[in-house]
Amino acid sequence: MQYQLLINGALVNGEGERQSVYNPATGEVILEIAEASPKQVDAAVLAADNAFTAWGQTTPKVRAECLLELADSIKQNALQLAKLESQNCGKPLHCVINDEIPAIIDVFRFFAGAARCLNGLAAGEYLEGYTSMIRRDPVGVVASIAPWNYPLMMAAWKLAPALAAGNCVVIKPSEITPLTALKLAALAKDIFPPGVINVLFGRGQTVGDALTGHEKVRMVSLTGSIATGEHILRHTAPAIKRTHMELGGKAPVIVFNDADLDAVAQGIRTFGFYNAGQDCTAACRIYAQRGIYDTLVEKLGQAVSSLKMGAPEDESTELGPLSSQAHLARVTAAVEEAKALSHIRVIAGGRQTGGKGYYFAPTLLADAKQEDAIVQREVFGPVVSITAFDDEEQVLRWANESRYGLASSVWTQDVGRAHRLSARLQYGCTWVNTHFMLVSEMPHGGQKQSGYGKDMSLYGLEDYTLVRHIMIKH
């Protein structure tokens, strides 16, 4: 099993404190890995800074070829990567193989193509005797912090646009789920020039702070919690570093009386519980119009109760464990707080399953009120709440009364209503009669406390560039 760090083109052992990496399906230790030492963090950033001189000047064709080669290598090693991701995260293996690995490969391939299509604006004479040009140039060294819910996919989302734009990257995966990022380091080692990609391991307070605060780091990209985002913004503020933040969500799912309720129930069964609900776009905050509320609660209860929990390697498993013992405790506390409210009805789940591993039963909580914490705070687990609403204006107000602004969906057969709400919902993405669908060509990112900046799409590529004006006198 690959457990070494990638620094300046070489795989090396960490020199810091050893940390245990767990299998969440069993609670057992997979292995121990040594963190990067402060000296190794410094070496990785300096390697990236040195490599940037040449990499930032390479042609888009060369960068694209490297990204395509890495995509091919991921495809060739797909089963090994999927098994590592499943073992370290508790994801059902078939979901990683069939859903996540193809999407990861596509992200690298998309940005390989996009790298060759990034242009500045046309030249022009805006002052007599002078010609102006607009360039889009790479930022420099990017420190990327990836989360524990989709370790390999988020590594791809961080690496691909940054590298395509000509930046060099030092990436730190979560210390909870580092195995696929470390394997990716081994695959990338002989494809990219030394220092272009560096992969470290360690906790935020020991490695993350040293990395994001390093004077040579020009940009920090984070996918994580609001609290982590706030910390990094405070930590990097004195140096005025560029930042790119994706900080979670609490997606409203608005279901009107005319919606196809069978499609809604089956959709939420998937969109609310994929990856054990550990997804910032999960369909977790349901608003159902009063005329269909009771029917939808019944249909959702049946759908949620039918989800099969089990071992990640079992092909029939739909729901795996949560990522860690600490996160299991957080999800349990959030549900217990909701259950203590007299108006909340537990339709399904609402408890840990017991036994080995960090499993929490798929949960549906009915009759939640707008002010309840279960409606307002991200749980990040297999937990969905449902609230009744009366009319369009009320539900629009409730949906937007949230500190989050990442994803939302509207379920209706009324095209005019779909357009009206889509235009007024304060979310980075709004789906109509579906949820959770992502493609490499379209941007993903939030507003409000869900952060700023885009992943994927040409907008994501532009976020890793600087706009520069060149003026020539003639």
Swiss-Prot record:
Catalytic activity: 4-aminobutanal + NAD(+) + H2O = 4-aminobutanoate + NADH + 2 H(+); 5-aminopentanal + NAD(+) + H2O = 5-aminopentanoate + NADH + 2 H(+)
Pathway the protein contributes to: Amine and polyamine degradation; putrescine degradation; 4-aminobutanoate from 4-aminobutanal: step 1/1; Amino-acid degradation
Active-site residues annotated for this sequence: E246, C280 (nucleophile)
Enzyme class, broadest EC rank: oxidoreductase
Top-level taxon: Bacteria
PROSITE patterns reported in the protein's UniProt record: ALDEHYDE_DEHYDR_GLU
Record's keyword terms, sorted: NAD, Oxidoreductase
Protein name: Gamma-aminobutyraldehyde dehydrogenase
